[in-house]
Amino acid sequence: MVKMSKQLRIAAPVEPVVVGKMGSAYGIRGWLRVFSSTEEAESIFDYQPWFIKRAREWQPIGLESWKRHNQDLIIKVRDIEDREAATLLTNCEIVVDASQLPDLDSGEYYWKDLLGCQVVTVGGYQLGEVIDLMETGSNDVLVVKANLKDAFGIQERLIPFLDGKVIKNVDLAAHIIEVDWDPGF
C-alpha cells in the first residue's frame, strides 16, 4: 500500500485530460477500483492532483493510498469512509491538467492531441476526422468519422497508426494527419 501526501489549495485543470475512471466500490471501508488509461497502469498515480466533475464544477480528489489487488488497482480516497460513499464515485472520470504529462520525443503523440485532426490521404482525399483511438496490442488504431459527402459511402474508418508505413505526416499545428491509405477501405 502506498500512502499519498496531502495537497493544499489546488487550481482546477486549465487543459483537462482524462487519465482513468473510478470503478466499483471495493469492500466496506470506502475503497474503489480504478481503471487507468495510462500506458503503464500504475503511472496514473504519477499525475497529481486528480479531479472529477460534479455539478459542472471541478472537484479535487485527494488520494489517501493505493494498492494492487490481483489485476486491479484499488484506491482509498480521502474522506470516503464507507462503501455507500465510494459508490457515488463509481464511473467518474479521473482528470488531470495536461501540464502534468511528460514531454514526448519526436514522433510520439498523446491521443488527446490526435483527436479532432483531419485525416487526408497522400493523394489529397479527405477521409474525415479522428473521433477516437483504440489500442489493439500490436498498434494503435485511428477511428475516423468520414465526411458527410464521402464518395465511397463509408461512415467510419479504422486506420492503423503505423508511423512511416501508413502514417506519413502528423501536423498538430494544422490538425492534419497524412496517411497512405486506400479511401475505399
Swiss-Prot record:
- An example Pfam family from this entry, by short name, is PRC_RimM
Q: Where in the cell is it found?
A: Cytoplasm
Q: Please list the GO biological process terms of this entry.
A: ribosomal small subunit biogenesis; rRNA processing
Question: Which GO molecular function entries does the Swiss-Prot or TrEMBL record give?
Answer: ribosome binding
Q: Which UniProt keywords apply?
A: Chaperone, Cytoplasm, Ribosome biogenesis, rRNA processing
Q: What is its main location?
A: cytoplasm
The UniProt entry's GO CC annotations, sorted and at most eight, read:
cytoplasm; ribosome
Matching InterPro entries, A to Z?
A: PRC_barrel-like_sf, PRC_RimM, RimM, RimM_N, RimM_N_sf, Transl_B-barrel_sf
Q: Which residues form the PRC barrel domain?
A: 106-185
Domain remark from Swiss-Prot or TrEMBL = The PRC barrel domain binds ribosomal protein uS19.
**Physiological role:** An accessory protein needed during the final step in the assembly of 30S ribosomal subunit, possibly for assembly of the head region. Essential for efficient processing of 16S rRNA. May be needed both before and after RbfA during the maturation of 16S rRNA. It has affinity for free ribosomal 30S subunits but not for 70S ribosomes.
Family from the record: Belongs to the RimM family.
* Subunit organization: Binds ribosomal protein uS19.
- Supply the name of the protein: Ribosome maturation factor RimM
Q: Which organism is it from?
A: Sodalis glossinidius (strain morsitans)
